[in-house]
């Protein structure tokens, strides 16, 4: 079950590979995510020393959050990946044009997981072509529905 999707990632990038990663979260963040108070739109992932971090993901604290904790809505959050996955991602992102983007946030066996994608940026004409294909697909479904 998806909690939040990053639709902009599918519009701006060709997604070539997908990997599921865990997140290091605080208690108030878990409560806020369960209440779907999270936004992935402007978030991205970068490599720093020994791990990948999610930056720009906005998690709005619940109004009932503890008074002695100062919630930081956009703090960097560490991603939990296997060493083989880390090596694979580092190897592919070192090639020109590849980046890692967050695709969605979901539950997996009661844990909050993030699906990340190895992506290559789309040019403007690629975006237009994708929009034309989506319009044609929608029109085709409409025609099939009306001919029945």
From Swiss-Prot:
PROSITE patterns in UniProt: SSRP
GO molecular function: RNA binding
Alphabetized InterPro entries for the sequence: SmpB, SsrA-bd_prot, SsrA-bd_prot_CS
Biased composition range(s): Basic and acidic residues: 127-142
Region named Disordered: 119-148
Keywords: Cytoplasm, RNA-binding
One cellular component (GO) term of this entry: cytosol
GO biological process, alphabetically ordered: trans-translation
Pfam families: SmpB (PF01668)
Entry's localization field: Cytoplasm
Top-level division of the source organism's lineage: Bacteria
Family per similarity comment: Belongs to the SmpB family.
Protein task: Required for rescue of stalled ribosomes mediated by trans-translation. Binds to transfer-messenger RNA (tmRNA), required for stable association of tmRNA with ribosomes. tmRNA and SmpB together mimic tRNA shape, replacing the anticodon stem-loop with SmpB. tmRNA is encoded by the ssrA gene; the 2 termini fold to resemble tRNA(Ala) and it encodes a 'tag peptide', a short internal open reading frame. During trans-translation Ala-aminoacylated tmRNA acts like a tRNA, entering the A-site of stalled ribosomes, displacing the stalled mRNA.
Name used for this protein in its record: SsrA-binding protein
């Amino acid at each position: 079950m998806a909690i939040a999707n990053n639709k902009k990632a599918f519009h701006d990038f060709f997604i070539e590979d997908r990997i599921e990663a865990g997140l290091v979260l605080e208690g108030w963040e878990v409560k806020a995510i369960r209440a779907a108070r999270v936004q992935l739109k402007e978030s991205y992932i970068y490599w720093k020393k020994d791990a990948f971090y999610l930056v720009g993901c906005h998690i709005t604290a619940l109004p009932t959050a503890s008074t002695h904790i100062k919630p930081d809505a956009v703090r960097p959050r560490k991603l939990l990946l296997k060493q083989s996955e880390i090596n694979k991602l580092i190897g592919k992102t070192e090639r020109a044009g590849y980046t890692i983007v967050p695709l969605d946030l979901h539950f997996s066996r009661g844990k909050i997981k993030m699906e990340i994608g190895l992506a290559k940026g789309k040019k403007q004409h690629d975006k237009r072509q994708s929009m034309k294909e989506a319009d044609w697909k929608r029109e085709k479904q409409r025609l099939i529905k009306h001919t029945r």
